[in-house]
Regions:
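Internal alpha-helical scaffold of NAD(P)-dependent oxidoreductase catalytic cores
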Residues: 91, 158-164, 182-222, 227-232, ...
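Rossmann-like NAD(P)-binding element
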Residues: 85-88, 92-127, 131-139
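Rossmann-fold NAD(P)-binding glycine/threonine-rich loop
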Residues: 132-165, 170-174, 178-180
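N-terminal secretory signal peptides that target proteins for export/translocation
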Residues: 1-12
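NAD(P)+-binding Rossmann beta1-loop-alpha1 motif at the extreme N-terminus of oxidoreductases
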Residues: 32-79
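Bacterial N-terminal signal peptides
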Residues: 16-29
């Protein structure tokens, strides 16, 4: 049975996201430039400008990438975009899909089915980093399906034809922000995907965000770092995560 959840007013939600990012020192003045990986900057679209979308998007902008944040109310993203500078822009979901080489899914999982239906043509062949987590109390039947079949495989079903890589789902935005480019060994971000080229791009973007990627395997193995999985929420180095992975084989 689907459970209705009353959302916060959208303006309040964006304001809360801005406060979170500003408090963590991520809203510094930004300028155009080559990405921190040394490769050419990419065009990235983000579906969902809430906590995860705005936080990870800010990391990529600081790394020199162009980012389009999208939502049903792109005009209400103006405060975020204005603060982030010339590498940031806002648009509709369709505009973001047309703009981007790579997409980040950062919306409640219950929305995936409708998004997949509305933009089926645009998703075909698109590299999509999936940061979603299925929450039973929020996401209804699709959340239940994802918990049973695995989020990675369920995302691949609803975003048919997209080149899915699971990434950035292992913790909340505040913890991601505080661990980005941390001193000492970089924090590991587990990733999983079936498409080698998409995994290669995800690896680069995880590093550009200030983390060290650890390839867990294909989409089916992304269960290991789904919410409730053994690798979920772990603030550990890549070396430690690889050590733990060996115990799951």
């Amino acid at each position: 049975m689907k459970i209705a959840v009353k959302p916060l007013p959208f303006r309040h939600y964006i304001f809360e996201c801005l406060l979170t990012i500003a408090g963590l020192g991520l809203l510094a003045p930004l300028a155009f430039g080559q990405s921190t990986s040394g490769a050419a900057a990419m065009k990235i679209g983000i579906i969902g400008a809430g906590n995860i979308g705005s936080t990870v998007g800010t990391m990529w902008i600081k790394a020199g990438h162009q980012v389009m944040f999208s939502s049903r109310h792109p005009e209400e993203l103006k405060p975020l975009v204005d603060r982030l500078g010339p590498l940031a822009r806002a648009g509709t979901v369709k505009q973001a899909l047309d703009f981007a080489e790579v997409m980040l899914m950062a919306v409640p999982y219950g929305a995936y089915g409708q998004i997949g239906r509305d933009y089926a043509k645009e998703f075909v062949g698109k590299i999509v980093l999936d940061a979603g987590n299925a929450v039973l109390a929020r996401d209804g039947e699709i959340g239940k399906e994802a918990r049973e079949a695995g989020v990675g495989l369920t995302t691949a079903k609803y975003l048919a034809g997209a080149r899915i890589v699971r990434a950035f789902n292992i913790m909340g935005a505040g913890r991601l922000a505080s661990n980005s480019h941390r001193p000492g060994e970089a924090m590991a971000i587990p990733i999983a995907g079936d498409d080698p080229e998409a995994v290669k791009i995800a690896t680069r973007l995880v590093r550009d965000a200030g983390f060290e990627p650890v390839l867990v395997g294909d989409l089916e193995r992304s269960r290991l770092f789904a919410q409730g999985g053994p690798l979920y929420g772990q603030e550990i180095s890549a070396k430690e995560m690889q050590k733990r992975l060996k115990t799951f084989k």
